[in-house]
Swiss-Prot record:
It comes from the Bacteria. Involved in resistance to arsenate. Catalyzes the reduction of arsenate [As(V)] to arsenite [As(III)]. The resulting arsenite is then extruded from the cell via the ArsAB transport system. This is Arsenate reductase. Changing residue 61 to A/E/R: Mutant retains arsenate resistance. Changing residue 94 to A/E/Y: Loss of reductase activity. Mutant is sensitive to arsenate. It comes from Escherichia coli. One of its GO terms (molecular function) is arsenate reductase (glutaredoxin) activity. Signal peptide: none annotated. Changing residue 107 to K: Mutant retains arsenate resistance. InterPro entries: Arsenate_reductase, Arsenate_reductase-like, Thioredoxin-like_sf. Belongs to the ArsC family.
């Protein structure tokens, strides 16, 4: 079993790029397709705490439930926002990566490089053509 876990959405380019950077370090992570297998309340609360971000910072804003539920309004408690994320996992921003070096919301995808123990094994270019890692495995930005 891998010591890296990614909460992944294969339809998301940022999530796909993050997964490939993990693989470029020589590790095959545990992949949780969080839309199909959402985290439990306790797991979600722990992820948020470990990332050191607010509950609201994990909310995706550009999805239908956000508008339908009126989540832009500042009237909801953190517990209520977590309830909404559990009921509508599409509201959980992604990808979230957990490694021995920390837990991060990897937006942009190269944030994952900050928490990988192993160096990149070679060049990495994002799907959009942006070069992130050179041939020697060194981060470019």
């Amino acid at each position: 079993m891998s010591n890296i876990t990614i909460y992944h959405n294969p339809a998301c380019g940022t999530s796909r790029n993050t997964l490939e950077m993990i693989r470029n370090s020589g590790t095959e992570p545990t992949i949780i397709l969080y839309l199909e297998n959402p985290p439990s309340r306790d797991e979600l609360v722990k992820l948020i705490a470990d990332m050191g971000i607010s509950v609201r910072a994990l909310l995706r804003k550009n999805v239908e439930p956000y508008e339908q539920l009126g989540l832009a309004e500042d009237k909801f408690t953190d517990d209520q926002l977590i309830d909404f994320m559990l009921q509508h996992p599409i509201l959980i921003n992604r990808p979230i990566v957990v490694t021995p070096l920390g837990t991060r919301l990897c937006r942009p995808s190269e944030v994952v490089l900050d928490i990988l123990q192993d160096a990149q094994k070679g060049a990495f270019t994002k799907e959009d053509g942006e070069k992130v890692v050179d041939e020697a495995g060194k981060r470019l930005k």
